[in-house]
């Protein structure tokens, strides 16, 4: 099933926009409203699964926390393993970490050292692409473990915040279901 304009419009309409959140001047795109609509949630998983069903994906990686909500069901539908990438000290086994820049400081992500094997063909899934910092760090973690990142897939792309261009510089193709301007 290729996504139709009607399906994509349905998904877009299921995402609420909240003005002045988390601070004045920001228009927040709330993907949790899509999750509250079982038709929209199922459709988003179906469309992502359909796109990647014949791509030879061996692992799906989801970033904390909303990436888990989309990545895990896609992995299940594809019949492959799901790998969580988390904030520091949230994973129980041995991990490697990658630090990345935030607007005001830095943060870090971790992955289990045995979660990705050399040669794994990985799909990275998250709810939203903005500046690309989180996915940049996630891609670096996967590559350090010998995995090949096939694509990065998102529900929402805030297309004017530069995330897609940042990831393309890393050789990562981005796919998103719903484009919005960033604010």
From Swiss-Prot:
Disulfide bonds: none annotated. GO terms for cellular component: cytosol. CDD domains: PRTases_typeI. It catalyses: AMP + diphosphate = 5-phospho-alpha-D-ribose 1-diphosphate + adenine. Its main location: cytoplasm. One of its GO terms (biological process) is adenine salvage. Pfam families: Pribosyltran. Homodimer. Belongs to the purine/pyrimidine phosphoribosyltransferase family. NCBIfam families: apt (TIGR01090), PRK02304.1-1 (NF002632), PRK02304.1-2 (NF002633), PRK02304.1-3 (NF002634), PRK02304.1-5 (NF002636). This is Adenine phosphoribosyltransferase. It comes from Klebsiella pneumoniae subsp. pneumoniae (strain ATCC 700721 / MGH 78578).
């Amino acid at each position: 099933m290729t996504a139709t304009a009607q399906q994509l419009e349905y998904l877009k309409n299921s995402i609420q926009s909240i003005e002045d959140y988390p601070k004045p001047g920001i228009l927040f795109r709330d993907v949790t409203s899509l999750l509250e609509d079982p038709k929209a949630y199922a459709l988003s998983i179906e469309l992502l699964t359909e796109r990647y069903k014949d791509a030879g994906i061996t692992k799906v990686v989801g970033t904390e926390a909303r990436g888990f909500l989309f990545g895990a069901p896609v992995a299940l539908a594809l019949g492959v393993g799901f790998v969580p990438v988390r904030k520091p000290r949230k994973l129980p086994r041995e991990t490697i970490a990658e630090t990345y820049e935030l607007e005001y400081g830095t943060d870090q992500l971790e992955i289990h050292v045995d979660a990705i094997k050399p040669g794994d063909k990985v799909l990275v899934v998250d709810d939203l692409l903005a500046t690309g910092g989180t996915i940049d760090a996630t891609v670096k973690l996967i590559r350090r473990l010998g995995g090949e990142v096939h694509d990065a897939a998102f529900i929402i792309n805030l297309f004017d915040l530069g995330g897609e261009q940042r990831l393309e510089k890393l050789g990562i193709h981005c796919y998103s279901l719903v484009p919005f301007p960033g604010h």
